[in-house]
Structures are given as C-alpha cells and as structure tokens.
Amino acid sequence: MDGQQLARKPRVLCFHGFRTSGKIFEEQTQVWPEFVREKMDLVFVDAPFPAEGGLEELGVAAELFDPPLYEWFQANKDFSEYRNFDECIAFVEDCMTRIGPFDGLMGFSQGAFLSAALPGMQAEGVALTCVPKIKFVMLISGGKFGGSNFSSPKLAPNAFSSPIECPSLHFLGEKDFGLTNGIELLDSFVDPVVLNHPQGHVVPKLDEKGSETMIKFIEKIQELL
C-alpha cells in the first residue's frame, strides 16, 4: 500500500459568511466537484449569534437565504469597534474541544476573517490554547484585522504581527468587492497558495485549473498529517 492510499482526509472546521449559517455554507460548497470535496472531512457549524436587525437591516441576506441566520461577531459601520469577539473565540475553542480534533479551518467572508486571524492568535497564546495547533487555513473572500479597512479587535492586535507560517489557500475573485482585502492578506502568510477566479464575493465554481490547485494543496496538507 503506497503513501497516497495511507493518507487520511484533513478534518476541517468551516466558518460561514456573515448572516448565513453552516447549512448554507455547506450548500455553497456543493458547486465544487465531488472529487475535490471528498478529499476533505468538512464540518460546518453555525456562528454563536443570531443575525441582528429586521428585514431592512438584514438586506440581501434575508432575500437570498432562509432563516435561521447567524453572525460570528458584530462591528460598527467603519469596523473600528467590535462586539462579542471574545465570546466568538471562546465559542470556537469550545467547538474544537467538543467535536474536534481538527486539522485546519476554512472560512468564507466574515468566517474567512476569523479563520485568518486564529493561527496568529494561537501562536501568541491568546486563543485556542487547549486544542491542537492549526495546520492550515483555506480563506474564501477574506481579509485581515488591522488592514487598510478594518481595525483589530482588542483580543487580536498582534494576530498578524509576525509572518504566519501556517499553509494557506486564498480564493481571490476578480469581481469580488473585497478583492483588495484578500490581496492585502496575502502578505501576512508565508508562501500563500492563490486560487484566482473570475467571480465575485461567492464560494466559486472551480474550473480545471482551480480544482487542480485545491487538490495539490490538500495533498500537500496530507503530507503534514
């Protein structure tokens, strides 16, 4: 039996986007070919806080998705202040303790911001101190706290102060309104792997090249397990 047959699937904790849910994120990933998805053990969870506001405040989320909808934390309009971020981190660690262990994280949008910050916070000893080290992250339409457009939550001022050596796969959409945030995030990781696609702020469909990029990244991760 060769090494490829012995390689196990990476177990991945998945963080959905702002005002959606674990179920919705799971459905969004169905656009990926089955041969890509079956390479991983993906575990989808709901964020700890119900989406705030009425239909008008929920906006597009209320139009596109069926409730219940959730969010990981809250911020003011210019992202200079955050609420419930510490509680969010505690919730994540509890999830990883109860239903783990996990090898890595995957996040979309708000979930990608969270996923991107956690390896640095864990290395600093301010988060995820009771669970195994995060071995990799996959970030779809992400960005970084402390970047050009977002301040840092009080718990995470140093999340990106040192280069993050954790292997990372970054999905960058040509039509994504947050593309500059995703590009800025690349500088915080050592040897980031980039998957470019022509779509917007979405979990993208994968062409042959995109599927190949994902498979190669996953196989690289399997060598670390």
Task: List each language-model region with its residue ranges.
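Gly/Ala-rich beta-loop-alpha elbow adjacent to hydrolase catalytic centers
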Residues: D103-S115
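Conserved loop-alpha-helix segment in the C-terminal half of the alpha/beta-hydrolase fold
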Residues: E174-P192
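The conserved beta1-alpha1 loop
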Residues: L13-G17, S141, L172-G173
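Short beta-strand/loop motif that positions the catalytic acidic residue
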Residues: P163-I164, S168-L172
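Short glycine-enriched nucleophile-adjacent loop
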Residues: A112-A127
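Catalytic active-site module of serine/aspartate enzymes centered on a nucleophile-bearing elbow/loop
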Residues: D207-L225
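Serine-hydrolase catalytic machinery in alpha/beta-hydrolase-like enzymes
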Residues: D2-F102
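Acidic catalytic loop of the alpha/beta-hydrolase fold
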Residues: F145-G147, L172-T180, H201-V202
